[in-house]
């Protein structure tokens, strides 16, 4: 009987990630500090326990100076790591863009900073020294007035950063450009020349993504190469001396698609491209296309992933933790109310992109999904910049973790212990497999709060009920110096 139950449990654990794909919120909402902060405009998770959140209109040190807050998960709640990272001066709007290659490094864009020229913009990189965020090197300033450098940033590692300045005029008015910098142990030094937009008004650099130090994808969402404002994306690789385009332009499908408004590369041979203005499924429903490199050309992987309804603007934000998983935001979707917003996760099943889970914004006008970040296939952060729970348009961010990663998390028992069913409606069977000396059973919730604790004498089987609402629970079984922990879903 025990072998059968164990086999059932193992088989269930194997098929569960394909079949259920449910996610539960990890901790409480992370609210913006004050009204009109628009916290959650940008989010980044370098791993499942760290998140950076931009509030580019925060007034903490000056009017609309902006700030970024980094949080760490302690097992039960999100705790701020260090102080706020504030912008330099009035109207800097620091935090519009950010990226974290690891949990101790962050690049932050302040696209209206006037350090070099008015609205030239700049980027600052910070390192965590164990107790505070310390700037690494000097500001990386934009080239000229109104460049808006720092509108987009991407860091594949702690010593490389790509910076988009979408209004730079080096190749024509508002053609835009991207610059890549590397750290030489003393300062940030440009790697290669500017990567300029193709023609005037392209706004190249509106989006940028680097999966590694030698590859970069650049979105120019107002390029007219395909047709008027269809947009395009170009991918470049470093040949040792210069940035060289890899393959042809990836053009948007139709006029006013704004393809390239969002891009993300999980690796050097995969790119996801958002076109929030695409009308394939309805006016401005939006779509996302994923492409792979076959050695010669960029080939679309599967068909278009279309927005659900008119004006959803699906594809406004994108995150790919790997080549077969994609999260995308539809910040104007009406799932729970007008412009409440949505985010969606899709998985490649070998032949098509399959919807795994959807996340609705909390309230009307939240614009949830304006930013998304997935550090892995089981965790997602979603920004809702107009949420007003802590003040009008203060914004908030929610983090969700997959409820499908169930089963044994830790054990040093020599014999097999089986807990079933999982998921459960509340009733649990615990088969210890052998008589154990005075086992103690402790149930805690996702926030580390103890829900139930029971002690037993010399038993090998028991039944108990999980009190409390549906959610994720942890069952700890102790007997002497032995311990095992199960992750259980209560439906």
Where are these regions (language model features)?
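Conserved beta-strand/short-helix segments
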Residues: 20-404
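Primarily marks secretory-pathway-exposed extracellular/lumenal segments that are disulfide-
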Residues: 5-6, 405-409
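Prokaryotic Sec-type signal peptides and long signal-anchor helices
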Residues: 13-16, 241, 318, 417, ...
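C-terminal outer-membrane/trafficking sorting elements
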Residues: 409-420, 424-491
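Compositionally biased, low-structure terminal segments
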Residues: 10-13, 24, 315, 360, ...
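Single-residue recognition of alpha-helix boundary sites
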Residues: 13-14, 285, 340, 433
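Bacterial Sec-dependent N-terminal signal peptides
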Residues: 1-22
């Amino acid at each position: 009987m025990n072998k059968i139950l164990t086999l059932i449990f193992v088989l269930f654990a194997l098929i569960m990630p394909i079949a259920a794909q449910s996610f539960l919120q990890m901790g409480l909402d992370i609210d913006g500090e004050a009204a009109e902060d628009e916290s959650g405009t940008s989010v980044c998770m370098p791993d499942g326990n760290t998140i950076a959140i931009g509030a580019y209109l925060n007034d903490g040190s000056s009017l609309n100076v902006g700030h970024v807050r980094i949080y760490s998960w302690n097992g039960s709640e999100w705790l701020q790591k260090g102080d706020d990272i504030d912008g330099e001066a009035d109207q800097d709007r620091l935090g519009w863009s950010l990226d974290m290659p690891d949990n101790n490094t962050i690049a932050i864009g302040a696209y209206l900073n006037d350090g070099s020229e008015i609205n030239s913009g700049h980027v600052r990189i910070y390192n965590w020294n164990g107790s505070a965020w310390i700037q690494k090197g000097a500001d990386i300033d934009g080239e000229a007035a109104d460049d808006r450098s720092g509108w987009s940033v991407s860091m594949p590692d702690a010593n490389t950063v790509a910076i988009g300045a979408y209004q730079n005029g080096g190749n024509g008015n508002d053609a835009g450009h991207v610059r890549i910098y590397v750290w030489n142990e003393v300062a940030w030094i440009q790697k290669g020349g500017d990567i300029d937009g193709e023609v005037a008004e392209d706004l190249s650099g509106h989006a940028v993504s680097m999966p590694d130090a030698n590859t970069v994808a650049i979105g120019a969402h107002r390029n007219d190469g395909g047709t008027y404002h269809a947009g395009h994306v170009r991918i470049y690789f470093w040949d040792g001396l210069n940035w060289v385009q890899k393959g042809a332009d990836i053009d948007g499908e139709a006029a006013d698609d704004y393809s390239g408004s969002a891009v993300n590369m999980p690796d050097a041979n995969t790119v996801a491209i958002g076109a929030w203005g695409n009308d394939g499924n309805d006016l401005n429903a939006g779509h996302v296309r994923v492409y792979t490199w076959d050695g010669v050309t960029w080939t679309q992987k599967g068909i278009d992933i279309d927005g659900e309804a008119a004006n959803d603007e699906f594809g406004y934000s994108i995150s790919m933790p790997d080549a077969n998983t994609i999260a995308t935001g539809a910040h104007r979707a009406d799932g729970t109310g007008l412009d409440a917003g949505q985010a969606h996760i899709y998985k490649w099943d070998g032949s098509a992109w399959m919807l795994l889970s959807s996340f609705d914004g909390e309230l009307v006008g939240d614009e949830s999904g304006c930013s998304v970040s997935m550090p892995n296939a089981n965790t997602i952060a979603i920004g809702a910049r107009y949420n007003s729970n802590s003040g009008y348009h203060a914004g908030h961010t929610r983090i969700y973790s997959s409820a499908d990663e169930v089963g044994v998390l830790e054990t040093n028992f020599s014999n097999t212990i089986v807990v079933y069913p999982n998921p459960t409606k509340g009733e649990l069977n615990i088969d210890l497999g052998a008589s154990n000396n005075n086992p103690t059973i402790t149930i805690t919730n996702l926030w580390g709060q103890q829900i139930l604790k029971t002690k037993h004498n010399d038993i090998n089987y028991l039944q108990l009920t999980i009190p409390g609402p549906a959610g994720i629970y942890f069952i700890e079984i102790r007997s002497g110096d032995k311990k095992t922990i199960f992750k259980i879903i209560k439906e």
